[in-house]
């Protein structure tokens, strides 16, 4: 008799994806972040659902409804802070996951990689709209500044901004539609994640050495299910430490002031996970140029497979490229720091230099280092 997990139509899909899936035997802890992203998504959907039961998307009551959740709803405070800090954990896992892909050459699976870039944009859009919902000062001014960037688009810009706002400024219509989009987008993300997995399972996972591993594969369960559970426990530990000991560590104090269109905060800045892109945006004096640089800061990931010049897929045995990769990490940390600083000397210059370096690493230095390493192989 055939095992039910191998014969039942639904169980068969789960079996082929999570149980009998042939997996390279040498994948490291860097491959844990995919499953952790799935866990983060589930946490966000569940906590978000419970928050939506008590939240009201009206400019007059949005701020009060969030306060009500924290003060009066049973365990509302923990749900709210798990959702807010869960977003930070989501982005930490996302950056680690993308970084792993760049380091080990996972971008060679172009379909999986491009769906991943689309996922990243969608997650960023969802997080941005979620930040607007509490209707604090930074929510309001963040929404105003970021949506206003679309006015840089020639000819249709102004009309587009007013269309998104639903009026002549960020107001009730904007908040209501942002709530609607923020609610529906995680389900779209879930669908895209399923497509992402579908494409990945067509080719099989990459591994640290970057070479074909068909001759040496092991079943996903129990080896990697156990490994993923360890990652999950560590993720929940860090999240709960954050939620229970310093829930406002990554937030902005200005967001505890109700939105006031007549009073601009001294420093308008987004959440920490957008600061690198925000720094790139601010480093260009021209508005349209800044918006293009902002979009390209993520879209440049799509160009990486086209600029791969090395004969080796992974950076595991490529010391020059490794140095460039860690330079990129340091550069991103610098950009994140600059994004949170006021627009004044010397931060402007540092931001411009870091932005130039960011694009140079991807477009010039990495392809050149690949060519040099190919030459070194012949020595």
From Swiss-Prot:
One of its GO terms (biological process) is mitochondrial electron transport, ubiquinol to cytochrome c. Heme b b566 binds at residues 97, 196. One of its GO terms (molecular function) is ubiquinol-cytochrome-c reductase activity. Its main location: mitochondrion. A ubiquinone binds at residue 201. It holds the Pfam family Cytochrom_B_C. InterPro entries: Cyt_b/b6_C, Cyt_b/b6_C_sf, Cyt_b/b6_N, Cytb/b6-like_sf, Cytochrome_b, Cytochrome_b_C_euk/bac, Cytochrome_b_N_euk/bac, Di-haem_cyt_TM. The chain crosses the membrane at residues 33-53, 77-98, 113-133, 178-198, 226-246, 288-308, 320-340, 347-367. Keywords: Electron transport, Heme, Iron, Membrane, Metal-binding, Mitochondrion, Mitochondrion inner membrane, Respiratory chain, Transmembrane, Transmembrane helix, Transport, Ubiquinone. It is found in: Mitochondrion inner membrane. CDD domains: cytochrome_b_C, Cytochrome_b_N. Its cofactor is heme b. GO terms for cellular component: mitochondrial inner membrane; respiratory chain complex III. Heme b b562 binds at residues 83, 182. Binds 2 heme b groups non-covalently. It is a multi-pass membrane protein. Heme 1 (or BL or b562) is low-potential and absorbs at about 562 nm, and heme 2 (or BH or b566) is high-potential and absorbs at about 566 nm. Component of the ubiquinol-cytochrome c reductase complex (complex III or cytochrome b-c1 complex) that is part of the mitochondrial respiratory chain. The b-c1 complex mediates electron transfer from ubiquinol to cytochrome c. Contributes to the generation of a proton gradient across the mitochondrial membrane that is then used for ATP synthesis. Belongs to the cytochrome b family. The cytochrome bc1 complex contains 11 subunits: 3 respiratory subunits (MT-CYB, CYC1 and UQCRFS1), 2 core proteins (UQCRC1 and UQCRC2) and 6 low-molecular weight proteins (UQCRH/QCR6, UQCRB/QCR7, UQCRQ/QCR8, UQCR10/QCR9, UQCR11/QCR10 and a cleavage product of UQCRFS1). This cytochrome bc1 complex then forms a dimer. This is Cytochrome b. The gene is MT-CYB.
